[in-house]
């Protein structure tokens, strides 16, 4: 990931992240990684309806274009993350890839890191579901803001 700091997010880079995540796994051996999803999937333990495989080829470039034209601040990162997770573009590993992208965006743009640790995992998932079902990232921004206050000493946001 360090090699990609300063490198623009592209569909190919997202696929590279997913390929690295699954390297050496059964998914990779079975040809189930290294590309966007081709089978409908869902978020485990959630009622959120994610994008269909046929929507991904246009939805991902649109999301990336929106990111490139954004102010690249805390709110933009939160919004991007909620939308990425709602698309759920890969067969597996979307949460891990989404959090990796979020960390890359924070580092590149001088934004306090948004870190979700185990003690906040359930709350994170609940807030993400609210953000995705209400078609707004306000909930995820509030959660990330409160998580930052808990995890970043001296944060005054």
Indicate where each model-derived feature is located.
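FIC/Doc superfamily catalytic core
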Residues: 1-157
């Amino acid at each position: 990931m360090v090699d990609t700091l300063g490198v623009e997010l592209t569909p190919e880079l997202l696929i590279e992240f997913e390929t690295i995540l699954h390297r050496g796994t059964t998914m990779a051996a079975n040809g189930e990684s290294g590309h966007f999803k081709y089978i409908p999937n869902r978020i485990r333990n959630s009622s959120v309806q994610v994008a269909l495989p046929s929507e991904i080829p246009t939805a991902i470039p649109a999301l990336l274009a929106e990111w490139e034209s954004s102010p690249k601040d805390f709110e933009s990162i939160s919004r991007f993350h909620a939308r990425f997770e709602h698309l759920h573009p890969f067969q597996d590993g979307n949460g891990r890839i989404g959090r990796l992208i979020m960390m890359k965006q924070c580092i590149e743009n001088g934004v306090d890191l948004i870190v979700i640790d185990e003690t906040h995992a359930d709350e994170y998932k609940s807030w993400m579901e609210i953000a995705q079902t209400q078609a707004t990232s306000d909930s995820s921004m509030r959660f990330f803001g409160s998580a930052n206050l808990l995890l970043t000493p001296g944060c005054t946001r």
